[in-house]
Amino acid sequence: RYKPLAAPGGISPMSRTSWSWRNGLNKPEIVMEGGNVADHPVLQTTTTPDLSLISTSADLAESLEPFYATSAATALAARMAAKIKTVNPDLSLLSVRGMMVHSARWTEEMKRIGSINDIMSICGYGIPDEKIALFSNERYATYIFENELIPYVRKDGSNTYNQLHFNDLPW
């Protein structure tokens, strides 16, 4: 008998993070379901189909097969990005990415990790909400401005304001 290693709402034990980097970079920006690992008294930790996602198989004898980890999470993120781009064809891919990040939230389990810096380096901004990302143009005030600016610069050993853009809103 085995039990899932990660708690519901937690990150997959197979997740790659920037936690050990300690340089302020956040990896990943979002987290998607990548399956879980089973804790077994004899096998120790192992993957199992019961805790994995499923997809169609190339093996005709087995129509479905489990897949997990980065392969599963990346496929789900790509699916969500494609759906956002389909609903909002005028958005750039950078804006699609921004919509995914903007819709993300931490679960209660993720919030138990500790400091905000630790959560950001392990979970990024959290799990994106597909409905918010897909329909935020219609139901929420979402302002997308694509341009380049450098808001802060380092001068004399401290951060200083640099650039700021003001935009007139249409209401």
Where is each model-derived feature located?
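Catalytic-core environment of secreted peptidases
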Residues: Y2-A75
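Long, K/E/R/D-enriched contiguous segments that form extended
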Residues: K3, S20-R22, V101, I116-I122
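Divalent metal-coordination and catalytic microenvironments
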Residues: I30, M80, M100
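Long, internal scaffold/assembly segments composed of regular secondary structure
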Residues: E62-S63, V96-M99, I116
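Short, small-residue alpha-helix embedded
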Residues: A73-V87
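An often Trp-containing, charged/polar helix-loop segment at the C-terminal end
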Residues: N88-R112
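Secreted peptidase-domain scaffold signal
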Residues: I119-W171
